[in-house]
Amino acid sequence: MTILGSISQIGSMKMGGSKSSFNGSSCGAGFGSNSSSSIISFFNPLLPVVAFISGTVTSITGLVAGALTGTVDGLGKGANTGILLGYTPNI
């Protein structure tokens, strides 16, 4: 129980630290003029959503690419095995 409690505390501390530094960096980016800071403050709540969508797209792309690579690799190995099995009795 105490181990789980300390782990959750560490996790919440880490999340809080990254969140505050993230907000600080985004506010610092829009510090130059009022228009850019207002645009950034408007889009600031949307940043986690954008990050989630881009992460999801990246993971789906990786899954598709991995599946295609595995399929091509599997087809190549299957063809090689079939050729070997087909020619071995004739030799």
From Swiss-Prot:
Residues modified by glycosylation: 23, 34
Regions annotated as coiled coil: none
UniProt membrane topology term: Single-pass membrane protein
Keyword terms of this UniProt record: Glycoprotein, Membrane, Transmembrane, Transmembrane helix
Primary site of residence: membrane
Transmembrane segments: 46-68
GO cellular component, one term: membrane
Annotated compartments: Membrane
Protein name per the record: Protein sigN139
Organism: Dictyostelium discoideum
